[in-house]
């Protein structure tokens, strides 16, 4: 005897008998016409049943990873795809090159592959993240002092390297005593305190 399954007709006669809709969410019963909010159960998570209304935490499987299914409860390592890169879905397991977006820049997501200009935050200042596009005032740490990162705001005592001694690296008060080194003795840097 055929029973009703989630508002449609069940494909398996053994489905939906006795326990109603709960017993109806079986792989053999999960047809596209059977995907309703009331039918979203773990056993119902198959490719043909991945609809937005079915996107609940218990239904987050790789086969269900679609743009319409990107929700915080669905952020698992097997579901980290570019289309799922939203602020609420930024977890360490999701930190991949395709997921480097400003809203995804969290301390646990600072990896070399994520070092892009839009991802330069203080918490991301690591040696592997020292790139020209990442040279902002909040990101100037000693290990970031590279020739490509020599900017006026980067002129601090810990950043006085020969490679950083360029005209654009003048400190506000000429050359501080900590910067007075023979390797850094450029005419543009020769102030009264540096003689």
Swiss-Prot record:
Keyword Nucleotide-binding: no
UniProt Sequence repeat ranges: 34-38, 39-43, 44-48, 49-53, 54-58, 59-63, 64-68, 69-73, 74-78, 79-83, 84-88, 89-93, 94-98, 99-103, 104-108, 109-113, 114-118, 119-123, 124-128, 129-133, 134-138, 144-148, 149-153, 154-158, 159-163, 164-168, 179-183, 189-193
UniProt keyword annotations, A-Z: Keratin, Repeat
Domain of life: Eukaryota
Region listing for 29 X 5 AA repeats of C-C-[GIKRQVH]-[SPT]-[STA], in residue ranges: 34-193
Pfam families: Keratin_B2_2
An individual GO BP term: hair cycle
Record's keyword annotation contains Protein transport: no
InterPro entries attached to this UniProt entry: KAP
Gene Ontology annotations for the cellular component aspect, listed alphabetically: cytosol; keratin filament
Tissue: Expressed specifically in the middle/uper portions of the hair cortex. Not detected in the hair matrix or cuticle.
Quaternary structure and interacting proteins, as annotated: Interacts with hair keratins.
Task of the protein: In the hair cortex, hair keratin intermediate filaments are embedded in an interfilamentous matrix, consisting of hair keratin-associated proteins (KRTAP), which are essential for the formation of a rigid and resistant hair shaft through their extensive disulfide bond cross-linking with abundant cysteine residues of hair keratins. The matrix proteins include the high-sulfur and high-glycine-tyrosine keratins.
Family: Belongs to the KRTAP type 4 family.
Protein name per UniProt: Keratin-associated protein 4-3
Organism: Homo sapiens
């Amino acid at each position: 005897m055929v029973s009703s399954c989630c508002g449609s007709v069940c494909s398996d006669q053994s489905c939906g008998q006795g326990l109603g809709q709960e017993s109806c969410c079986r792989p053999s019963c999960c047809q596209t016409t059977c995907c309703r909010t009331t039918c979203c159960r773990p056993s119902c998570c198959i490719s043909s049943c991945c609809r937005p209304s079915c996107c609940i935490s218990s239904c987050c499987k790789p086969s269900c990873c679609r743009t319409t299914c990107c929700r915080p409860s669905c952020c698992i390592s097997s579901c980290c795809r570019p289309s799922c890169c939203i602020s609420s879905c930024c977890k360490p397991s999701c930190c991949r090159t395709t997921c480097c977006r400003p809203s995804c820049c969290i301390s646990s997501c600072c990896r070399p592959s994520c070092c892009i200009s839009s991802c330069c935050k203080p918490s991301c200042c690591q040696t592997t993240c020292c790139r020209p596009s990442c040279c902002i005032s909040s990101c100037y740490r000693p290990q970031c002092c590279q020739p490509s990162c020599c900017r006026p705001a980067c002129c601090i005592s810990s950043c006085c390297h020969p490679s950083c001694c360029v005209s654009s690296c003048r400190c506000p008060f000429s050359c501080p005593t900590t910067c007075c080194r023979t390797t850094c003795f450029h005419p543009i840097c020769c102030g009264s305190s540096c003689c």
